[in-house]
Amino acid sequence: MSSLADLINLDLSDSTDQIIAEYIWIGGSGLDMRSKARTLPGPVTDPSQLPKWNYDGSSTGQAPGDDSEVIIYPQAIFKDPFRRGNNILVMCDAYTPAGEPIPTNKRHAAAKIFEDPSVVAEETWYGIEQEYTLLQKDIKWPVGWPVGGFPGPQGPYYCGVGADKAFGRDIVDSHYKACLYAGINVSGTNGEVMPGQWEFQVGPTVGIAAADQVWVARYILERITELAGVVLSLDPKPIPGDWNGAGAHTNYSTKSMREDGGYEVIKKAIEKLGLRHKEHIAAYGEGNERRLTGKHETADINTFLWGVANRGASIRVGRDTEQAGKGYFEDRRPASNMDPYTVTSMIAESTILWKP
């Protein structure tokens, strides 16, 4: 091998049947991602074929030093775009040795909601628009911004093209392709309103798989920014002032909404979401009050409002849905740092299971 790059890209399939499985879990902040790798004897196609594992929870803020073992359960498998071949990424959730979900394990409660027969019958679809900001490593300032200064006002950057408008496209496109390789249902990307901010969309994907895919897409993005020497930020308002924040708009539909007469089902679901507005806001991401101000294409955090084609609303219904009399709606309240397990399951619970 002539270089480090050759070794990184070394194909093991001709020399061994063994594979590398990268186990991924959510750390103590509820947002940080951790991972470690292990060797397995051969290719794996289902999480049930994988062994549970453990890690030092005292080093992630998830367990005390005198009882530090946390157990991770494999839940979803993806192809590894970094090692390739038969190697895999494994999304896990975390439990105590006694089998109880630890506090940062939001997947466990979400799975119970998605396994409810009423929710299963409705075949919930999600499309999640994950916005994020790329920061310069040493100064934590958006890429493309002058050090200690600001770029020109917002306007030319949204879906912009050119060296003075789009900053970090190589990272964005690498991430797009890596997610498709991994088996994540990424449906698109675009540059956002604030320079240095981008978005990728996951979906439509059914049930809890939508959240699994968003988490692994975040992991892949963080690995790519690591290689690029850039810092990934999911802060919902990374730059104060007259700059757009970052959200995770969540598009949602049920089988009943997608069928004839579904628009009435949509309106009833939105009414229920309005009745639980405070509960949803409390679960929709840390620091969201800095983003949901009623400006920059947001509704005020204390006000629930819905409308057709209204990007200043809490819930937006598309013109095509209104005209067809069926379809989906967009919950614009979730922040970029939201937990997709919490948000997707809470929307399903409020619209299908909850009785006012």
UniProtKB/Swiss-Prot annotation:
Its EC number is 6.3.1.2. Residues 37-66 are annotated as: Disordered. The modification N-acetylserine is found at residue 2. Induction: Down-regulated by ammonium supply. GO terms for cellular component: cytosol; plastid. It is an enzyme of class 6 (ligase). The keyword GTP-binding does not apply. Residues 19-99 form the GS beta-grasp domain. The keyword Acetylation applies. It is found in: Cytoplasm. SUPFAM superfamilies: Glutamine synthetase, N-terminal domain, Glutamine synthetase/guanido kinase. High-affinity glutamine synthetase. May contribute to the homeostatic control of glutamine synthesis in roots. PANTHER family: GLUTAMINE SYNTHETASE (PTHR20852), GLUTAMINE SYNTHETASE CYTOSOLIC ISOZYME 1-4 (PTHR20852:SF113). Homooctamer. Interacts with GRF3. Belongs to the glutamine synthetase family. This is Glutamine synthetase cytosolic isozyme 1-4. It comes from Arabidopsis thaliana (Mouse-ear cress). The gene is GLN1-4.
